[in-house]
């Protein structure tokens, strides 16, 4: 993709001959986040390797791999049996307790036991942050963030695209942070200016303000004066191939994700700065530099998707330069199979 100027002097993306020869599509970015077909639950290996985590009254709320169930039974058998009823015939893992606080206490004990004794690497990244599983718009159980993948729940976050638009040239530049080399996940990859998980009991906008100060050292007044809610993206994060995956390892986890998306238009004199050690640096990327980084897979996958969302909404990615435009836009808003926050 090459950035050129339109007859009105605006920046536009033009598809090149090289793009056509390589068959390039921004759909590749979607595939890195969610390659699952609509009928993924009908695949034989999915039916064999996946169990549904359910509420005490049978509402499905998560995907749990059989090997993860085996690990929990091995590491914390007593807590597991007190927490869940395992139905092998229906492939269901059902909470036993009808009480919110009791469920939270049990799942917290289970998570801590897994952290100390499990062989699963993901649970070692303890965050001391709870994610809520929502049913009927209310929190059903609170889960330590580090075991969200084990239980296959829907998680939520906020992602903000920060940009500067030159009033004369109309050229856009993006504030792009590079993740810290010490980050537990995706170290040194490119990110959105501000992003963070929706930890309980923080609200969505409350998280926007909290993360803005923590990650970019941006004051509340800057955010309130310049932020704009622009929608959401939703997907089932999965890195395998549904046709061959055996669902017998951590990289086979399926986690539903909802990202609430915001635009933050900043003036040239407002400069984000690393504040909490999670960001190495902030840099201004031109539109061409951003496109190049997307193509080179330098962005964290879901951050790349949020950037693509911006490029679609602002008219840079269009039906004229993206051969899979309709599929891309549709797949960025997957209808998730479990109850959601809103």
From Swiss-Prot:
Record's miscellaneous remark: Present with 217 molecules/cell in log phase SD medium.
Domain of life: Eukaryota
GO MF term (any one): 8-oxo-dGDP phosphatase activity
PROSITE patterns (UniProt xref): NUDIX (PS51462)
Protein name from the UniProt record: Uncharacterized protein YJR142W
Domain Nudix hydrolase as annotated: residue spans: 155-309
């Amino acid at each position: 993709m090459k950035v050129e100027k339109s007859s009105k002097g605006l920046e536009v993306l033009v598809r090149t001959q090289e793009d056509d020869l390589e068959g390039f599509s921004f759909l590749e970015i979607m595939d890195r986040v969610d390659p699952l077909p609509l009928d993924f639950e009908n695949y034989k290996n999915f039916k064999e390797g996946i169990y549904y985590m359910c509420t005490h009254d049978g509402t499905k709320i998560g995907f749990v791999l059989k090997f993860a169930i085996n690990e929990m039974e091995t590491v914390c058998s007593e807590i597991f049996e007190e927490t869940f009823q395992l139905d092998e015939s229906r492939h269901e893992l059902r909470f036993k307790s009808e009480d919110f606080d009791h469920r939270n206490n049990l799942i917290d004990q289970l998570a801590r036991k897994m952290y100390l004794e499990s062989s699963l690497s993901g649970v070692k990244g303890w965050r001391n942050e709870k994610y809520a599983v929502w049913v009927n718009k209310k929190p059903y159980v609170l889960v330590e963030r580090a075991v969200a993948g084990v239980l296959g729940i829907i998680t939520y976050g906020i992602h903000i695209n920060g940009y500067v638009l030159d009033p004369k040239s109309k050229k856009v530049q993006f504030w792009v942070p590079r993740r810290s080399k010490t980050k537990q996940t995706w170290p040194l990859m490119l990110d959105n200016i501000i992003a963070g998980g929706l930890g309980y009991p923080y609200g969505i906008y409350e998280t926007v303000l909290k993360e803005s100060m923590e990650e970019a050292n941006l004051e509340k007044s800057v955010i309130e004066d310049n932020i704009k809610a622009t929608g959401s993206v939703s997907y089932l994060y999965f890195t395998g191939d549904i046709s061959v995956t055996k669902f017998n390892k951590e990289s086979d986890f399926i986690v539903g994700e909802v990202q609430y998306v915001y635009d933050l238009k900043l003036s040239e004199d407002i400069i984000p700065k690393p504040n909490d050690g999670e960001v190495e640096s902030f840099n201004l990327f031109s539109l061409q530099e951003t496109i190049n980084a997307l193509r080179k897979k330098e962005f964290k996958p879901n951050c790349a998707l949020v950037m693509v969302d911006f490029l679609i909404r602002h008219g840079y990615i269009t039906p004229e330069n993206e051969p899979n435009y309709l599929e891309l836009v549709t797949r960025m808003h997957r209808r998730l199979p479990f109850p959601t926050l809103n």
